[in-house]
């Protein structure tokens, strides 16, 4: 059993290395998913921020959590694209004929998404610091933020895996991400939900992004998190489990 586990994780490591090499050979993926959220952050802070009432003195502090989620939602679309291209090229069939763990190729793509999105998040936070972002959070709060963002990334990445495995075209593989990118705009990411019309506010307060954004914002400000963190974790974990099981089912059907 220990030998099987060792080979399984070794196979995943090889596939992760393969996918990461593709990323670093073509850095436009990370650059694209980093530059767009940064441009959005610049626009909202320096052009629109003065007209938005959030109850905080520093709008970039309020804005950053939502920008990070948008960056992640943008980044996972490339996972769907890369998976689709692997399926189309027939490389998965070649992997299945080799003495390696069957799902290691899929896990390689998922972990690559986690690493590449983590790089984007770090770059965006560094830019936010230059723009005036400040946090009083301690190491434990930062670790909690990292954990929430990692779970959010994994949850969306497994959704991306479903799209990449099921899509009939390149456009179809990436199109699923548009609603995910749009969700932060109907949440507390940019403005408090109190300012929204009734039906919009009801939707905003009961969708996953608002609780995730509020939890991260409170952690970074060293403020009481309340139930937001548990609601955020429940959303992330629920989506992660469902998407993982569905993606593995689709993968096994494709591999059969």
Q: Which residues fall in each region the model found?
A:
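Membrane-interfacial helix-loop-helix junctions in multi-pass membrane proteins
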Residues: 22, 53-54, 187-242
């Amino acid at each position: 059993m220990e030998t099987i586990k060792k080979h399984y994780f070794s196979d995943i490591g090889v596939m992760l290395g393969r996918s990461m090499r593709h990323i670093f050979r073509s850095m436009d993926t990370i650059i694209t998913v980093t530059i767009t959220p940064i441009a959005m952050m610049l626009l909202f802070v320096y052009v629109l921020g003065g007209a938005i009432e959030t109850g905080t003195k520093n709008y970039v502090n309020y804005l950053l959590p939502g920008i990070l989620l948008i960056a992640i939602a943008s980044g996972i679309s490339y996972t769907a694209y890369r998976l689709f291209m692997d399926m189309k090229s027939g490389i998965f069939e070649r992997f299945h004929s080799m003495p390696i763990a069957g799902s290691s190729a899929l896990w390689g793509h998922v972990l690559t998404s986690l690493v590449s999105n983590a790089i984007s998040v770090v770059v965006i936070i560094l830019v936010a610091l230059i723009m005036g972002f400040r946090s009083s959070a301690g190491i434990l709060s930062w670790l909690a933020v990292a954990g929430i963002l990692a779970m959010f990334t994994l949850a969306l990445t497994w959704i991306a895996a479903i799209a990449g495995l099921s899509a009939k075209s390149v456009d179809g593989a990436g199109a699923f991400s548009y609603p995910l990118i749009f969700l932060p705009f109907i949440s507390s990411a940019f403005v408090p939900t109190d300012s929204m019309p009734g039906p919009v506010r009801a939707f905003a307060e009961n969708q996953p992004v608002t609780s995730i954004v509020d939890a991260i914002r409170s952690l970074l400000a060293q403020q009481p998190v309340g139930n937001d963190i548990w609601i955020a974790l429940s959303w992330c974990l629920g989506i992660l489990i469902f998407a993982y099981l569905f993606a593995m089912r689709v993968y096994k059907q494709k591999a059969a």
